[in-house]
Amino acid sequence: MAPGARISLLLLITFTLLGPQRSGAFPAMPLSSLFANAVLRAQHLHQLVADTYKEFERTYIPEAQRHSIQSTQTAFCFSETIPAPTGKDEAQQRSDVELLRFSLLLIQSWLSPVQFLSRVFTNSLVFGTSDRVYEKLRDLEEGIQALMQELEDGSSRGGLVLKTTYDKFDTNLRSDEALLKNYGLLSCFKKDLHKAETYLRVMKCRRFVESSCAF
């Protein structure tokens, strides 16, 4: 065989072997790694939003008013209108596929509102991280979708739809009404991320028994 023909054949074999690895957005990963990555993303994002909530509260909400405001914030959380588990015990009664669908629904309900987050919070080190929230939210969405593809054998099935979505964050921080609105939205965002994190940790723990299951 001529040298040129041998080189062409070698290149053809090389590209054939590399082709399947480059066909997807992410390389194939074990299910345990997919769960571990999703849990870490959810934990980090939940903590980031919790810190932002605390900083917003400290900066804009008088301490004497916090309790009365917090007691009425549940009305802002549209996620309460879906039959999602409210805690670890309830989550353990649901299948993994159900929990993934609830998690995805909660995450996707915030993709639009959080795009305005960085325009609202610009004067603090904590608020300065808010421009990363959308990116991290999309990363978590992709992680959950990857898990759903694995558990549903790659099929795409319809799920629940949140009929009422969250409003965008208000950029007018000089208005008391806007401050209360943003405070309520941050509270709901924090609660919804806590739910999603809980669901992912429940699934990971019952599939891969480990010491961190106590939470």
Curated annotation (Swiss-Prot):
Keyword list, A-Z: Disulfide bond, Hormone, Metal-binding, Phosphoprotein, Secreted, Signal, Zinc
Amino acids binding Zn(2+): H44, E197
One GO term of the biological process aspect: growth hormone receptor signaling pathway
Modified residues (Phosphoserine): S130
SUPFAM superfamilies in the cross-refs: 4-helical cytokines
Cell location: Secreted
Disulphide linkage map: C77-C188, C205-C213
CDD domains: somatotropin_like
Disulfide bond recorded as keyword: yes
Cross-referenced Pfam families: Hormone_1 (PF00103)
PROSITE patterns: SOMATOTROPIN_1, SOMATOTROPIN_2
Entry's Gene Ontology molecular function annotations: growth factor activity; growth hormone receptor binding; hormone activity; metal ion binding
Signal peptide positions on this chain: 1-25
Record-level GO cellular component terms: extracellular space
Family: Belongs to the somatotropin/prolactin family.
Protein's job: Plays an important role in growth control. Its major role in stimulating body growth is to stimulate the liver and other tissues to secrete IGF1. It stimulates both the differentiation and proliferation of myoblasts. It also stimulates amino acid uptake and protein synthesis in muscle and other tissues.
Protein name per Swiss-Prot or TrEMBL: Somatotropin
Organism (species): Trichosurus vulpecula
